[in-house]
Amino acid sequence: MSMFNKVVKQFQWGQHTVRMETGEIARQAGGAVIVDVEDTVVLATVVAAKSPKPGQDFFPLTVDYIEKTYAAGKIPGGFFKREGRPSENETLTSRLIDRPLRPLFPEGFYNDVQVVVHVVSLNPEIPADIPALIGASAALAVSGIPFNGPVGAARIGYKDGQYLLNPTRSQMATSDLDLVVAGTERAVLMVESEANQLSEDVMLGAVVYGHEQMQIAINAIHDLVREGGKPEWDWAPAPKNEALIAKVTEVALPLLQEAYQLRQKSARSQKLKEVSANVTAALAEAGVDADKVEVGNIMFDLEAKIVRGQILGGEPRIDGRDTRTVRPIEIRSSVLPRAHGSALFTRGETQALVVATLGTKSDEQIIDALAGEYRDRFMLHYNMPPFATGETGRVGSPKRREIGHGRLAKRALIPVLPKDDEFAYTIRLVSEITESNGSSSMASVCGGCLALMDAGVPVKAHVAGVAMGLILEGNKFAVLTDILGDEDHLGDMDFKVAGTDNGITALQMDIKVQGITKEIMQVALAQAKEGRLHILGAMQGAMGHARTELSAHAPRMITMKIHPDKIREVIGKGGSTIQALTKETGTTIDIQEDGTITIASTSTDGMAEAKRRIEGITAEAEVGKIYNGTVLKLLDFGAIVNILPGKDGLLHISEIVNERVKDIKDWLKEGQQLRVKLIQADEKGRLRLSLKAALAEEGGSISPVNAGEAAPAPAPAAAPATPSDQQQ
């Protein structure tokens, strides 16, 4: 009899077999589920506090996705040889799991909940994010914690007009779409995607297809819960204090209505603070001992009712716009004189200063991912300091939100970047959010595209992004173009769409309620396209195309090709040759395994010199050619003469002059410059040289050392011109 009450469910999901089990591992957690998809295995656990902390006024959900290096048969690098701070991918995947789970916890549930997902085995072809999301949903479902799930998820690709369900990494390499969709049986809750300029219809079709296919996983979770689930918690939300609601409404409602007639954010924020203070004072005067959290929730509900009612009633939005109007746009390029490219993009009260920097191959980011090391030539970093919203706060390493926003903006721009062989530079974009009132990630997309063009990056098309909102009450709904921060906060769905004139490059949706249909999403995407095209028009008017010249402060680059066998000669022993080259010419030199060499410098002369010297190092000595040589060493029977970098040959004593030479020191000395002819090269690469043959061909002469400076007379005719000749 086993000590474990192990429950296993297995199902076929597209091309993959999925196995879920609970009851054996991590039994002291509230819920624990192992998910195995073709050898990619995750352990998902959830624990919830039995009661909320005193004064808790928000739902404290924490999601940690952790990749263990042993999952891929690796040992961590670094001094301590153990996993450290989360990688960017771990942070992004944690957010991916958090977003569809958070809306499904009941209103008023303020207990701490921690979801931890460990990747314990990885098949490099099967990404772990979808198994992790399914596992987290299943762990919550079996735990009995109040949760309106389960959630399913799927990755959708698109190639040759066909949707791909949970494609492998190899299949994703040629797919025009990478879309992750998550939701419940009845509704889509989250979409995260990157696309190669696809139409709205194709994108919506992918969302619908993904929602259909995830039902297989949802049904399997239901089966797992029936056999291995724990009893549901006996939890109910605290009863509403109707007397308090009435009192707060009496004081706050007229004041809040006044506040939401103020069009400027700073004035409105100040007024809302005054309203809150007035409510607190009125309650104290009435002798009501009210909980601050409860009062705050009532105020939030009143604000939502006012804003949502105004919009659904056809009244102007918070800042006076109708539902389709984009805020005024101002664009300025070349803002920073020493930066390689820069743009200031302002849309209403949201502003991004985006700066582009061009670098060389050595500036690429090397990412030691669980599935294998790779290099990234395009980076986008998003920063939002507290002053952007008129607040004080911590300044330092990026938070999860900043990493997520930067990733979304990056995904929007990747499809229009030139290929490596067209533009060999490493590119870094930094978006500094200097003002924020909604849609700062989409401002980063617009400003990022303009900064790239200002830097001379030949992007394929302009890319613009717009953040949309949606308010749904029964059968009535309103789609909002270019939402404000308050509209995002008080709405039912926010989605961000970025793309070109030809199609969508990135789409992100977060839906807080059920009941948003395919038809509503269709209307929302059509309105988003209208807004995107309006912004694209403004951008194209400000900068029609990328600059044809790079900034004077950006490095120039040339590429050349050598035989791969010659790479070691360019590098030299212990890197001595290439180090000397870079130092003496003031260049950066990168060598690929296929023999492609990239030389970069702000000095054109330095690049040309480095190229010339590399050509000399890699040049092949040709029999019958005459070279400038330097005597390196004298021997009894001849001399060692260098004719090319790394190419030394033997000048035999019989090949110096036609007469008999008794002592070589009578004719040659170390350091002496000579014109010598290569007369033989054997299969081992040994070279035989002749001074007398060169003299005979060029018509020069040589005198004994003791007769003066022994040097061949200059030839009357020009010698054969080679790159190696020019080097000397």
From Swiss-Prot:
Lineage, broadest ranks: Bacteria, Pseudomonadati, Pseudomonadota, Betaproteobacteria, Burkholderiales
Molecular function terms from GO: 3'-5'-RNA exonuclease activity; magnesium ion binding; polyribonucleotide nucleotidyltransferase activity; RNA binding
Chain positions recorded as Mg(2+) binding sites: 488, 494
Function noted in UniProt: Involved in mRNA degradation. Catalyzes the phosphorolysis of single-stranded polyribonucleotides processively in the 3'- to 5'-direction.
Catalytic activity: RNA(n+1) + phosphate = RNA(n) + a ribonucleoside 5'-diphosphate
Gene: pnp
EC assignment: 2.7.7.8
PROSITE patterns: KH_TYPE_1 (PS50084), S1 (PS50126)
Chief localisation class: cytoplasm
SUPFAM superfamilies (alphabetical): Eukaryotic type KH-domain (KH-domain type I), Nucleic acid-binding proteins, Polynucleotide phosphorylase/guanosine pentaphosphate synthase (PNPase/GPSI), domain 3, Ribonuclease PH domain 2-like, Ribosomal protein S5 domain 2-like
Official protein name in the record: Polyribonucleotide nucleotidyltransferase
